[in-house]
UniProtKB/Swiss-Prot annotation:
PROSITE patterns: HOMEOBOX_2. This is Mating-type-like protein ALPHA2. The gene is MTLALPHA2. Induction: Induced by HBR1 in response to hemoglobin and growth signals. One of its GO terms (molecular function) is DNA binding. It comes from the Eukaryota. Belongs to the TALE/M-ATYP homeobox family. Gene3D superfamilies: Homeodomain-like (1.10.10.60). One of its GO terms (biological process) is negative regulation of conjugation with cellular fusion. It comes from Candida albicans (strain SC5314 / ATCC MYA-2876). One of its GO terms (cellular component) is nucleus.
């Protein structure tokens, strides 16, 4: 492993560590994560300027990119959850008021019954991030499935089906060496 690969591997490990921290602990220091990510961006920028990247370096860069997207979405989700909880308690206090109008809340409940059939971008990023992290053995354990259920707000069967479909997609995209040789010569 050359010095670039070692540095990129370390950056990838640090980002993965932040993802695990955010997944496992409800309380974390966002400033610490931000400072670390900014320092890693500076390191990556200097590595990119060297223009002597190997295939392994490029693969590590792709993994870092995937981790950074997942980390970004997780931070956004945490911020939104915090804002949602503040909004919930504010609305709850307002609804406890004797001056609240119950007809408005009935109309809002009817609008919420319409559900989308596709997964949101955030859900896909969380699931894809998990898959990329566990690409060598993409079979979720019970605790991992529960974490994915909580972070994506999907049902157990939706999470399991997505993982199964993603494994199949990964398997179907791989071309055997014999077939690759035939395709290249033909």
């Amino acid at each position: 492993m050359n010095s670039h690969s070692e540095a990129l591997f370390e950056i990838n490990q640090r980002l993965s560590s932040h993802i695990r921290t955010m997944s496992n602990f409800p309380v974390f220091d966002p400033q610490k994560i931000t400072n670390d990510v900014e320092a890693n961006i500076k390191r990556m920028t200097s590595i990119l300027k060297s223009k002597r990247l190997t295939r392994e370096d490029e693969d590590l860069m792709k993994m870092i990119n995937d981790c950074s997207k997942v980390l970004h979405e997780m931070l956004l989700e945490r911020i939104m959850l915090q804002q949602d909880s503040i909004q919930f308690f504010t609305e709850k206090e307002a609804s406890d008021s004797p001056f609240s109008n119950s007809a408005d809340t009935i109309d809002e409940d009817d609008d919420k019954k319409i559900k989308s059939r596709r997964l949101t971008k955030k859900q896909l990023l969380v699931l894809e991030g998990w898959f990329q992290k566990h690409k060598n053995h993409p079979y979720s354990q019970k605790d991992q499935t529960n974490l994915l259920i909580k972070s994506t707000k999907l049902s157990k069967s939706q999470v399991q089906n997505w993982i199964s479909n993603r494994r199949r997609k990964e398997k179907n995209t791989k071309v055997s060496p014999e077939l690759a040789a035939l395709l290249l010569t033909g």
